[in-house]
């Protein structure tokens, strides 16, 4: 229960989050390897999320969510494209894996920034031979992420790795979380600032896709966060995508 309380409190402070940094995207493609190094800006406010990537100063990719839907603006292709999807549905198969790994829920899960809450499995953490704790939680289900296996450093109670598992218990994606430092958080004194991983390394099980995130001066205060970052209509006016794909078939729900 103490481990749950520590992670849940830490994750709650990250519901407001902003950072600059660098993202490196590597993937094997026919005939060789694709590599992109991008400047990053990330903003999160509750369930709202925005991630901007720039390459050589030009817009490259914008991923965002208003808490109900999420979207990807692909800004360098011909034609430029916007894909809009509901958060409660699986991922389209034509979306590149490196883009789907940067989606709001997946990124927060694999970076160890989500609470355990009631998702923690009842068999609880196990102490492995390497002295680290292992535990499992339910995953979002997106893209086959049915469970998450966490590796926790017990002294500081911080996740150092997260694995996304499919419905057969096979690892789909694995992350390594490194270089923790305390970051400023809203309404928290310096001594209570939460620990945040400065480096998140993500690799899929095939080894064909690799995403490396290097955060620069992250904070949980939210001083630069503005509503327009999460407003899809305003983003469309700004980016003017040449092709728009709405994939909004939703899980049926009972009307209020």
Model feature map: region roles:
Residues 1-39, 95-98, 126, 244-256:
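N-terminal leader/targeting segments and the immediate start of mature chains
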Residues 108-199:
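Extended beta-strand-rich segments in extracellular/periplasmic secretory proteins, especially
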Residues 23, 53-57, 67, 76-77, ...:
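A mature extracytoplasmic/lumenal domain signature
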Residues 9-17, 32-35, 42-47, 63-65, ...:
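Edge/loop elements at the starts and ends of beta-strands within beta-rich repeat scaffolds
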Residues 20-22, 33-39, 43-48, 158-161, ...:
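Beta-strand-dominated lipid-handling architectures at cellular/organellar boundaries
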Residues 44-106:
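An acidic-aromatic
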Residues 129-131, 166-256:
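Non-transmembrane domains of secretory- and envelope-associated proteins
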Residues 44, 65, 146-164, 214-226:
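A short, surface-exposed beta-strand/turn
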């Amino acid at each position: 229960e103490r481990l749950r309380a520590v992670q849940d409190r830490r994750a709650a402070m990250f519901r407001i989050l902003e950072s600059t940094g660098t993202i490196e995207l590597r993937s094997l493609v026919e005939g060789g390897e694709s590599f992109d190094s991008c400047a990053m800006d990330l903003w999160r406010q509750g369930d709202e999320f925005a991630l901007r990537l720039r390459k050589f100063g030009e817009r490259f990719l914008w991923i965002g969510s208003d808490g109900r839907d999420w979207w990807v603006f692909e800004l360098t292709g011909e034609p430029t494209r916007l894909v809009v999807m509901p958060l409660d549905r699986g991922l389209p198969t034509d979306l590149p894996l490196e883009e789907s790994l940067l989606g709001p829920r997946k990124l927060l899960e694999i970076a160890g920034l989500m609470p355990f809450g009631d998702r923690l499995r009842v068999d609880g953490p196990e102490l492995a031979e390497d002295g680290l704790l292992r535990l499992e939680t339910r995953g979002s289900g997106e893209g086959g992420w049915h469970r998450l296996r966490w590796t926790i450093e017990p002294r500081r109670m911080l996740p150092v790795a997260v694995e996304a598992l499919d419905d057969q218990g096979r690892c789909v994606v694995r992350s390594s979380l490194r270089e923790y430092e305390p970051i400023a958080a809203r309404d928290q004194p310096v001594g209570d600032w939460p620990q945040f991983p400065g480096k998140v390394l993500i690799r899929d099980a095939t080894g064909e896709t690799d995403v490396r995130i290097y955060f620069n001066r992250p904070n949980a205060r939210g001083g630069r966060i503005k509503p327009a970052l999460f407003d899809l209509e305003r983003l469309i006016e700004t980016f003017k995508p040449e092709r728009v794909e709405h994939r909004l078939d939703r899980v049926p729900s009972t009307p209020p």
